[in-house]
């Protein structure tokens, strides 16, 4: 899948789940399950409840996503 086809949204971490999964409430009100991208995992970027994050989603499954950036 090409990078241009990804949907990029912002949201807030609502809940922490096992295996570096998170429940994210998007700015449009939807709640999705998201995991950390490989680079964030490699560099040990910590994500806590309440952090603002940038999430990439596939247009085929709008209930799952990948966290690509943690806002300061």
UniProtKB/Swiss-Prot annotation:
GO cellular component terms, A-Z: cytosol
CDD domains (alphabetical): S1_IF1
GO terms for MF: ribosome binding; rRNA binding; translation initiation factor activity
Keyword tags: Cytoplasm, Initiation factor, Protein biosynthesis, RNA-binding, rRNA-binding
Family: Belongs to the IF-1 family.
Its biological purpose: One of the essential components for the initiation of protein synthesis. Stabilizes the binding of IF-2 and IF-3 on the 30S subunit to which N-formylmethionyl-tRNA(fMet) subsequently binds. Helps modulate mRNA selection, yielding the 30S pre-initiation complex (PIC). Upon addition of the 50S ribosomal subunit IF-1, IF-2 and IF-3 are released leaving the mature 70S translation initiation complex.
Name of this protein: Translation initiation factor IF-1
Species assigned in the record: Alcanivorax borkumensis (strain ATCC 700651 / DSM 11573 / NCIMB 13689 / SK2)
């Amino acid at each position: 899948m090409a990078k241009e086809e990804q949907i990029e949204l912002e949201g807030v971490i609502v809940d922490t789940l096992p295996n570096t999964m998170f429940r994210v409430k998007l700015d449009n009100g939807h709640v999705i399950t998201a995991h950390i991208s490989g680079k964030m995992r490699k560099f040990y970027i910590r994500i806590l409840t309440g952090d603002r994050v940038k999430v990439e989603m596939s247009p085929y499954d709008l209930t799952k996503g990948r966290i690509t950036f943690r806002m300061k």
